[in-house]
Swiss-Prot record:
Active-site residues from the entry: 321, 579, 582
Cellular localisation: Golgi apparatus membrane
Motif DXXH motif positions after renumbering to this chain: 579-582
Gene designation: XOAT7
Protein name: Xylan O-acetyltransferase 7
Ranges facing Lumenal side: 146-605
Organism for this UniProt entry: Oryza sativa subsp. japonica (Rice)
Length: 605
């Protein structure tokens, strides 16, 4: 009887609650009597109306729920409007009341059965209610955070990293150049060379017209070359005959059809000194400029064709680190045509002065020999040669020249090591340069740089004329490789430092030429000595003027210093550490070797 009475009392309370709620619907402006008196009952009603989701709320637990905060306490007495309903726990009015009542009423037929045979029920505990309440709070919190996040202003960006900005600016160069230049045109013909590239950027070089570039020679073609290949090379010889290879323009090859000739990642023989991209450079635009001679085309570089010319032969680069730079380029150009396991590189042969790349299938070698002055000097050690006080023996060449015998293609250079001083120290003794206990003799004379350069080349030319068989050996002399230390020479900005951050060639060359520090006296000396040679014809590869435009192609701060990569702090100090002498690879030295290839193909044909 007691349980029945309690049930009737609860029903009466719900009836009064619904009546007051209906009255409040007609007067919604003020806190209702039902809200003030029956808010705890509303919560109990919600709890009892969802028996399968939320068990009835224990009376001992209710104060903990409704009195958690001062805000809810004030709401219970009607001092505040109801808080935003995270889970719609508001008084149910109107149609919602009827739906609640309908859900609470059991089916008529099921009521007696349920009364007679009540199903066993586990008494719900506070933990089950707490779990349901926690789930509702999690959902409400998620919805609140989502809405709140949409209204919040975006977080402020952190202060920019200047180094990252520099790298980003460097990286944008490729996209800018690609937007400025159309894709490379179809293969050019000699009769339409100028018009085919009119839509591309052209950088012209004014040159004197007295260059003797008529190609020919006494050597015969290599044996074992296919007839089709011979016909192709003969046609290329006709294309080159009478062509001024070194007068022309730089053309940006946006499509990359002809430049670069290989990828940095594809050549495992490159040293860290020249791998600029691997060392942190962000743009590769310096790799995409190709040289377009005036009035002709360079033959397409064919590594297999060159290896056929080198079959059973030796090619050797002799000189300073710029010739080593070019030698590395040549190794990368030919190695792509050689299968894995059929190519090797041996360094520091013959007391360290000789490096040998060998293509075993062709029995061919591409070698480099260290001799920065060609004649003997106190800088001849290939690894420890940073000597401030340089001394040369301008009549002593036999020691180095003994390693040049039997070579079929000799490529010489000497220039950059002459630029430290305006005067060179030259030994007075005509004998061996070493005296006494093995040290260099202190008896020397200071000689003007150009005069000493001429005497050294005369010593070298005499050896070539006497020792080289022109029917077996072809000799090339590379002109001066320029440096770029003076931004004011090409109109650089006020804050420009050497060649650092340069990303494009020089485009504002005047008819009088550039003055970037190249010693053109040595250029004239070299040409004069070569013209005086009668027995052996030496090909002068005149790369100086066209290379002066390439301020963008140096290794700059993306290189080594004393055998170690520059640190970020050193890279940030280009005034001290930028290398504006050597060149990135792939890069400008590939063009120099393209000239060699053109001459070798023409001679062989």
């Amino acid at each position: 009887m007691k349980k029945k009475k309690n049930g009737m009392g609860a029903a009466a309370d719900r009836g009064r609650l619904l009546a007051l709620a209906h009255h409040d619907k007609l007067n919604p402006t003020k806190p209702s009597e039902a809200q003030r008196r029956f808010k705890p009952s509303i919560l109990l009603l919600l709890g009892s109306s969802l028996p399968r989701l939320v068990p009835p709320l224990p009376s001992s637990f209710l104060p903990v729920v409704i009195k958690q905060t001062e805000f809810h306490q004030r709401w219970l007495v009607g001092d505040l409007n109801p808080p935003p309903p995270p889970c719609h726990l508001l008084p149910i009015q109107g149609q919602g009341q009827m739906q609640m009542q309908q859900r609470r009423k059991p089916p008529p037929a099921a009521a007696p059965v349920a009364a007679k045979q009540p199903s066993p029920r586990r008494t719900p505990g506070p933990l089950s209610f707490a779990g349901a309440l926690l789930s509702l709070l999690v959902v409400a919190t998620f919805l609140y955070i989502n809405d709140h996040g949409n209204m919040m202003p975006p977080h402020a960006s952190p202060d920019p990293d200047l180094r990252l900005l520099q790298e980003a600016a460097h990286q944008k160069v490729n996209s800018i150049l690609l937007s400025r230049h159309a894709p490379a045109p179809p293969p050019r013909t000699n009769t339409n060379t100028s018009s085919s590239d009119q839509h591309l950027r052209l950088i012209n070089i004014p040159m004197s017209s007295d260059l003797d570039l008529e190609l020919g020679g006494n050597s015969t073609s290599s044996s074992g070359v296919e007839i089709q290949f011979e016909q192709q090379q003969q046609q290329e010889e006709k294309n080159l005959r009478g062509c001024e290879l070194y007068k022309g323009r730089w053309v940006y090859d946006a499509a990359g059809r002809e430049a670069p000739l290989y990828r940095e990642s594809e050549c495992g023989f490159l040293t860290e000194q020249v791998t600029c991209m691997r060392n942190g450079r962000r743009d590769d635009s310096y790799q995409r400029w190709r040289w377009q001679p005036e009035g002709c085309d360079l033959p397409s570089f064919d590594a297999r064709a060159l290896l056929e010319r080198l079959r059973n032969k030796r090619m050797m680069f002799v000189g300073d680190s710029l010739n080593r730079n070019q030698w590395e380029s040549m190794v990368c150009l030919v190695q792509s045509a050689i299968p894995y396991g059929q190519k090797t590189l041996t360094k520091f042969v013959n007391n360290g002065s000789l490096n040998v790349f060998r293509a075993h299938e062709y029995n061919a070698t591409v070698e480099f020999y260290w001799a920065p002055f060609l004649v003997q000097s106190n800088s001849d050690d290939p690894q420890v040669h940073s000597v401030r006080d340089r001394v040369i023996a301008w009549r002593s060449i036999a020691k180095h020249a003994a390693n040049w015998k039997g070579v079929h293609y000799l490529v010489f250079n000497t220039y950059i090591w002459w630029l430290n001083n305006f005067q060179i120290k030259v030994l007075k003794s005509r004998g061996a340069p070493f005296a006494g206990s093995g040290g260099w003799s202190s008896r020397y004379a200071l000689v003007d740089r150009a005069i000493a350069y001429r005497e050294v080349l005369k010593t070298w030319a005499k050896w070539v004329d006497r020792r080289i068989d022109p029917n077996k050996t072809h000799v090339f002399f590379m002109a001066m490789s320029p440096n770029h230390f003076m931004p004011e020479a090409w109109g650089g900005s006020a804050g420009a430092v050497k060649c650092a951050m340069e990303t494009q060639p020089i485009v504002n060359r005047t008819s009088g030429g550039l003055d970037i520090g190249t010693d053109w006296r040595l250029h004239g000396v070299a040409r004069g000595v070569l013209r005086s040679m009668r027995r052996v014809g030496v090909r002068f590869v005149d790369i100086t003027a066209l290379s002066e435009l390439r301020k963008d192609a140096h290794t700059s701060v993306h290189t080594l210093r004393q055998g170690k990569l520059l640190t970020p702090e050193q890279q940030a100090d280009p005034r001290t550490y930028a290398d504006c002498i050597h060149w990135c690879l792939p890069g400008l030295p590939d063009t120099w070797n393209h000239f060699l290839y053109a001459h070798i193909v023409a001679h062989a044909a």
